[in-house]
Curated annotation (Swiss-Prot):
Protein name, as recorded: Large ribosomal subunit protein bL33
Encoding gene (name): rpmG
Homology family: Belongs to the bacterial ribosomal protein bL33 family.
Residues of the signal peptide: none
Species for this entry: Synechococcus sp. (strain CC9902)
InterPro entries cross-referenced by the UniProt entry: Ribosomal_bL33, Ribosomal_bL33_CS, Ribosomal_bL33_sf, Ribosomal_zn-bd
High-level lineage: Bacteria, Bacillati, Cyanobacteriota, Cyanophyceae, Synechococcales
Length: 66
């Protein structure tokens, strides 16, 4: 028998400043993304976490994307 879906899901976090930054401000091209898990029962809204962005070489706000 198959198990039902768990409460923990995998989410992707994307840097909010990488999209608006010009190429001259970035250390390397692209957008910083992290994958993590969240508990659907405890955290119903989208995650917003300060994480290190290697493209901008500083701590930036990372928001959950679909």
């Amino acid at each position: 028998m198959a198990k039902n879906k768990g409460v923990r899901i995998v989410v992707t976090l994307e840097c909010t400043e990488c999209r608006s930054a010009s190429a001259s401000e970035k250390r390397s091209p692209g957008v910083s993304r992290y994958t993590t898990e969240k508990n659907r029962r405890n955290t119903t809204e989208r995650l917003e976490i300060m994480k290190f962005c290697p493209q901008l070489n500083k701590m930036t706000l990372h928001k959950e994307i679909k």
